[in-house]
């Protein structure tokens, strides 16, 4: 545990609540002190859904501390069972209430005997895993629970569907453009004549989980959630899974080719016809997706050699690193992820596509890295958006965590062939807006503003006088930030407090600003 005013991935119980609130007729009970109840408000605000968030807090108060939690927790489970009639109730503590070291598993077992609903305790180590890891573990636990129950009741049908079919695992609430990605992947599978067996956990019923083994394969669009479930199916049922991220034209083609290999392998067993998706890949790449054509246009060639920095979750950071570097000719000077548990896979994916790699969940290190790199554009999370604004660097948001403006009401997938178009737009426009700011500044547009000192730290820098600020304003905007930082660096090294025009020219000679 650590004290921080910003976290890229939240505490473990948030991941469990996200899985529970994604599923149909599932209720979560959170054993937590006051102050941990913000999930309901956060989800209602960001997802803009009409339904109430199915999560209830069993508050740890002074009475609980004096007498223990069992009576209160069991009463809350029974109350929600009577009021909501859910198929499943998931009981989870928070990192704070875990300090009490109470046997919540025993509470869940006792409640399940009395309740008409199934009750399980989220088996997550709240001190060792974050929000995304907990979501992955909780999803696998719920799936395993219902399949084991069906196996004991001898109601588990392991026969596969006649036509090729797939499960889509890992789409869930508060995900970055997850709803749009789900629609795009449904369309992709429909184009490939593959039936969608089930989507979990988003919109899925726990009573239908027993039908998951009927699919020919599992598709895992995100590394963060769904991988443990896919590995469980591979081990227990021999079901293949595809974890190649269908983002960008190149990886999109590779993902479809993997689907083709698995479908043709199973076609021999089920006496179905083999498939050939190469004409589909060619047609989509050349005529449907505009990104492939755009990457060869003169507009995109203007970005060749430009530098950028990418940071986000492992899935989006890896893909957004490869797309500009491989498909648009943009140099990625730094790329990184806050998913430290997936560092090995991340490094393997972006090998050769960037100059340096940063694996950290410390936003201060990320800010310092961005300040050193001085990129032409920045792609990251909401935090990198703030950092870019402070450093006057054009920026785009490509990964969670994000604020409400990135929960788009319009259709904006990042996966699939339509996703390639949606990615190309913000990548190009982020760079283009840098030139727009320059033109607005030259012609006295609405964007003229006082130049502020840019620094990734909170210390007070040297003071610019009116003459030096006037001289600085004459420098084009795209080079101004670099000149400003180099001059301030020179002033600090020389112990100069007030920056004059003479100091600016001295810094230029020494630092080649």
UniProtKB/Swiss-Prot annotation:
Its cofactor is [4Fe-4S] cluster. Component of the dark-operative protochlorophyllide reductase (DPOR) that uses Mg-ATP and reduced ferredoxin to reduce ring D of protochlorophyllide (Pchlide) to form chlorophyllide a (Chlide). This reaction is light-independent. The NB-protein (ChlN-ChlB) is the catalytic component of the complex. Its main location: plastid. One of its GO terms (biological process) is light-independent chlorophyll biosynthetic process. It is found in: Plastid, Chloroplast. Protochlorophyllide reductase is composed of three subunits; ChlL, ChlN and ChlB. Forms a heterotetramer of two ChlB and two ChlN subunits. This is Light-independent protochlorophyllide reductase subunit B. Its EC number is 1.3.7.7. It comes from Ginkgo biloba. SUPFAM superfamilies: Helical backbone' metal receptor. Gene3D superfamilies: 1.20.89.20, Nitrogenase molybdenum iron protein domain (3.40.50.1980), Proto-chlorophyllide reductase 57 kD subunit B (1.10.8.550). Pathway: Porphyrin-containing compound metabolism; chlorophyll biosynthesis (light-independent). The keyword Transmembrane helix does not apply. The keyword Zinc-finger does not apply. Binds 1 [4Fe-4S] cluster per heterodimer. The cluster is bound at the heterodimer interface by residues from both subunits. InterPro entries: ChlB/BchB/BchZ, LI-POR_suB-like_C, Nase/OxRdtase_comp1, P-CP_red_C, Protochl_reductB, Protochlorophyllide_Rdtase. Pfam families: Oxidored_nitro (PF00148), PCP_red (PF08369). It catalyses: chlorophyllide a + oxidized 2[4Fe-4S]-[ferredoxin] + 2 ADP + 2 phosphate = protochlorophyllide a + reduced 2[4Fe-4S]-[ferredoxin] + 2 ATP + 2 H2O. Belongs to the ChlB/BchB/BchZ family. Keywords: 4Fe-4S, ATP-binding, Chlorophyll biosynthesis, Chloroplast, Iron, Iron-sulfur, Metal-binding, Nucleotide-binding, Oxidoreductase, Photosynthesis, Plastid. NCBIfam families: DPOR_BchB. GO terms for molecular function: 4 iron, 4 sulfur cluster binding; ATP binding; metal ion binding; oxidoreductase activity, acting on iron-sulfur proteins as donors; oxidoreductase activity, acting on the CH-CH group of donors, iron-sulfur protein as acceptor. The active site is at residue 299.
